[in-house]
């Protein structure tokens, strides 16, 4: 579905939504000359990013993981700055993303060096064996793990490494935003699970309390700051931060195999299932955002969405359904996903974190329902031009339809995907 959003680039009288030339300064002669050209850089960059995302969670050692991190990150830095409209905002977001991403990569690399100094290997299995044997300086191991987590938590958008998320979500082309929101988060959490469960599973008493604090801060900051947003894409950015906290709550549910009851949902199952449910709702939501436009491009101001339910009830209804899933309303995939991660966290004794997660979910319901209220029960303010809904292409319509179907089916029948997630968990282990 993320690929479908990329493929649908010509939405304004046949003109690409991406900038005509990546290296051109906004408003320059070079940009005006390239304005009508197809932007062929987009597809190679996207394929490089996908290659890195596939390698990232499959890495068996820290060096390969670092290379995959860079392969997926560098194309995203460029793609974030390619919006044809609002070029300055897009390039500002890309620059912030690049600078902060470079720092996080440096932390990850330094953490690799410290872990190698402790274990004498970068292989995740070898690191786990060294921890179990108790060899080396444990202080070096702890600092090294902390620096590795900085690099990965930046990619998933956890507090306090989240500041890039709302800016990039707002400034990047919406197709890129949807791609990043779903695919990058899946790849980054896959790598995080592999690092913690395979390489540092024997040291979980060290990283679980730290992740617990980060999860609490991430959920509260994401939910509270989303309440005051007036831009739809920026609101979804802070919503993504809150969902990162919910996913980290599931990671806290890691337990030894012997501690699990028969048939109990594992932490891996819960997190992978939540990632699937979140991806359906997120890709569907951003697909809808690409359709709501005005003469200057995408209309993402919340006041412009007033009365959208009257002008285009199907599009507004689909967006409302995705928001209800993100809120965790029963009979949606989001409810099943939150139930899974909260259950495994409770079984591992992380009930204080679960209480904060429930509180954050209640706060999040406010801004989701507020958006629905604006679309269906509000009129456009006097002097404000209402946003129109462009005619969706086959690819965009298919993306929204598949997202709606997936969100509904996973909310009603979550069992098959949970079983599939259990099998996928064997790969991560």
Model-derived features: positions:
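Alpha-helical transmembrane segments of multi-pass membrane proteins predominantly involved
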Residues: 1-429
């Amino acid at each position: 579905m993320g690929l479908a959003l990329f493929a649908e680039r010509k939405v304004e009288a046949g003109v690409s939504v991406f900038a005509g030339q990546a290296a051109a300064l906004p408003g320059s002669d070079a940009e005006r000359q390239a304005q009508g050209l197809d932007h062929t850089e987009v597809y190679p960059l996207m394929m490089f990013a996908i290659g890195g995302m596939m390698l990232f969670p499959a890495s068996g050692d820290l060096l390969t993981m670092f290379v995959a991190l860079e392969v997926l990150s560098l194309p995203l830095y460029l793609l974030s700055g390619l919006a044809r409209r609002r070029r300055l905002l897009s390039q500002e977001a890309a620059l912030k993303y690049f600078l902060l991403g470079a720092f996080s990569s440096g932390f990850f690399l330094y953490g690799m060096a410290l872990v190698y100094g402790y274990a004498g290997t970068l292989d995740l299995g070898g690191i786990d064996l060294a921890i179990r044997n108790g060899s080396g300086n444990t202080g070096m191991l702890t600092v090294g793990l902390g620096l590795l987590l900085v690099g990965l938590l930046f990619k998933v958008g956890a507090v306090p490494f989240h500041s890039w998320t709302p800016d990039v979500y707002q400034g990047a082309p919406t197709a890129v935003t949807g791609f990043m929101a779903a695919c990058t988060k899946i790849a980054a959490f896959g790598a995080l699970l592999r690092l913690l469960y395979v390489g540092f599973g024997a040291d979980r008493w060290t990283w679980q309390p730290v992740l617990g604090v980060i999860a609490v801060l991430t959920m509260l900051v994401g939910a509270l700051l989303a309440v005051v947003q007036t831009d739809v894409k920026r609101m979804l950015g802070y919503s993504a931060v809150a969902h990162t906290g919910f996913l980290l709550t599931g990671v806290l549910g890691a337990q030894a195999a012997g501690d699990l009851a028969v048939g109990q949902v594992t932490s891996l199952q819960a997190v992978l299932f939540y990632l699937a449910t979140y991806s359906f709702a997120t890709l569907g939501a951003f697909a809808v955002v690409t359709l709501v436009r005005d003469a200057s491009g995408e209309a993402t101001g919340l006041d412009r969405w007033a009365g959208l339910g009257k002008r285009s009830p199907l599009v507004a209804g689909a967006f409302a359904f995705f928001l209800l899933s993100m809120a965790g309303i029963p009979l949606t995939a989001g409810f099943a996903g939150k139930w899974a991660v909260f259950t495994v966290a409770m079984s591992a004794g992380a009930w204080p974190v679960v209480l904060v997660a429930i509180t954050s979910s209640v706060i999040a319901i406010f801004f989701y329902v507020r958006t629905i209220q604006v679309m269906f029960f509000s009129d456009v303010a006097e002097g404000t031009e209402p946003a129109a809904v462009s005619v969706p292409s086959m690819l965009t319509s298919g993306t929204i339809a598949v997202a709606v179907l997936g969100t509904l089916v996973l909310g009603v029948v979550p069992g098959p995907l949970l079983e599939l997630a259990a099998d996928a968990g064997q790969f991560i282990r």
